[in-house]
């Protein structure tokens, strides 16, 4: 069981990642901030420097990573393609699946929306805060192997070849609302 879950966590994926345009204008960064504040701060914290989000002596101890460019953060290490790979495909730059990160929820984002999110993440000030690695305990590993937590190996839950939606122009319309 330990070996099975360890193999799940260490399995690597080679997914072709399509480059997208990352804007730098203040309006795009502001839109990205809105997305990030509504989607990411629950686990990564209000300042996005990461925080403890699960601490159960039977299951696991898990920290969401620091997304800023500070020491211990991903922001200084991730390229634009790394951000796309992580957010849209649930895959770390080294090819391993992200664990728990709900990337499957971002597969419906347009390239423009994802670009805005990445633009905002790249604009963050650095916060020096390294987070410990996740620890899955025996009961947690049993539940992971049984699928009790759903698709925590995000790379296996995502249709990586799916068409991405087009951007809906803001304005009064049936599509926009």
Task: Tell where the protein language model's regions lie, with residue ranges.
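C-terminal capping alpha-helices of c-type cytochrome domains
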Residues: 1-3, 79-92, 105-131
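N-terminal type II signal-anchor transmembrane helix
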Residues: 1-11
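Electrostatic cytochrome c docking/interface patches
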Residues: 12-36, 147-177
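Interaction-mediating elements
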Residues: 24-25, 29, 89, 95, ...
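The canonical Cys-X-X-Cys-His
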Residues: 32, 37-46, 83, 117, ...
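Gly/Gly-Pro-rich "capping" loops immediately C-terminal to redox-active cysteine motifs
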Residues: 33, 47-85, 97-110, 135-148, ...
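Detector for the c-type heme attachment site
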Residues: 43-49, 88-89, 102, 106, ...
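Inter-heme linker and motif-flanking segments adjacent to c-type heme-binding CXXCH motifs
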Residues: 49, 91-96, 123-132, 168-174
């Amino acid at each position: 069981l330990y070996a099975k879950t360890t193999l799940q966590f260490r399995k690597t994926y080679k997914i072709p990642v399509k480059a997208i345009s990352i804007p730098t204008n203040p309006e795009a960064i502001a839109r990205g901030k809105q997305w990030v504040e509504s989607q990411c701060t629950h686990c990564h914290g209000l300042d996005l420097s990461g925080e403890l989000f699960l601490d159960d002596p039977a299951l696991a101890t898990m920290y969401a990573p620091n997304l800023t460019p500070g020491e211990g953060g991903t922001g200084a290490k991730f390229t634009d393609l790394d951000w796309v790979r992580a957010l849209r495909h649930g895959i770390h730059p080294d090819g391993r699946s992200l664990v728990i990160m709900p990337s499957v929820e971002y597969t419906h984002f347009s390239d423009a929306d994802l670009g805005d999110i990445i633009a905002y993440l790249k604009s963050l000030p650095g916060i020096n805060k390294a987070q410990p690695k996740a620890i899955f305990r025996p009961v947690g590993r049993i539940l992971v192997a049984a699928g009790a937590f759903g698709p925590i190996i995000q790379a296996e839950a995502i249709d990586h070849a799916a068409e991405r939606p087009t951007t809906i122009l803001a304005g009064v319309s049936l599509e926009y609302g």
